[in-house]
Amino acid sequence: MEFVQYACNGAVAEIILNRPDAHHALNEQMLSELKEAVEMAAASEALIVLLRGSGKGFSAGGDIRMMTSEHDPDQFKRLMDTIEAVTLNLYQMKKVTIAAIHGAAAGLGLSLALCADIVLAEKNAVLAMNFIGIGLVPDGGGHYLLKKRIGEAKAKKLIWSGKKLSASEAADMGLLDGTFAGDPAEGARPIIETLLASPLLAMIETKGIFQSLQIEELKKVLSLERSAQERMRRTKDHQEGIRAFLEKREPKFQA
């Protein structure tokens, strides 16, 4: 794999986003590789899975360059199929999953991080569910995952504003389970060591019970997000959002 690294060492597996020259922006190839890595982790004997980015950040979200050309229904279907598979596999994985964020976690990158059981961020990290800036709605289960962590009212406000959150702000509102200083692999180490000394099989059973009650809601949200994304990608606001992003100016939305 070119853009995603996978390693498994006994009870701990790591999935590392590795497209640093593009801030780990998720293009079609990278998403496909991420799907493969998540499937490998799910099938492994590991009981803990760590998701992190290499270099200077976690993920800037979906690659904006995939959105600059005319809407391609076939590519859109492939992308959404892959995003949904990654989301469901990460969320349902019979492991204890940890996302360790450093740098930026934005858009789809943040949605994927929120699939984890335990979400950590480096103290200087920045988090944003910023689809609104290009006239889109969250995907990757972002609506469900935000609602689950911070409630519908706060989730809606965050999605509508696209506000950038510091790690401390995100922790205060319940979006994070903790913060750390320095490298994400080292930052996650204390909690991994605690987990390795815990009855992980029982913890994973509890995870499965909770998720069996919620999985149909996540699947429904993914379906609704797919439909909404397809509609919004055809709007003038989305086209203006993309142009403004590329031209490094404020968008002029007209609805």
UniProtKB/Swiss-Prot annotation:
Compartments it resides in: Cell membrane
Annotated InterPro entries: ClpP/crotonase-like_dom_sf (IPR029045), Enoyl-CoA_hydra/iso (IPR001753), Enoyl-CoA_hydra_C (IPR014748)
Main localization category: membrane
NCBIfam families, A to Z: PRK07659.1
Segments passing through the bilayer: 96-116, 126-146
Name of the protein in its database record: Putative enoyl-CoA hydratase/isomerase YhaR
Keyword vocabulary terms for this entry: Cell membrane, Membrane, Transmembrane, Transmembrane helix
GO cellular-component term (any): plasma membrane
Organism: Bacillus subtilis (strain 168)
Membrane disposition: Multi-pass membrane protein
Family: Belongs to the enoyl-CoA hydratase/isomerase family.
Keyword ATP-binding included in the entry's annotation: no
CDD domains given in the database record: crotonase-like
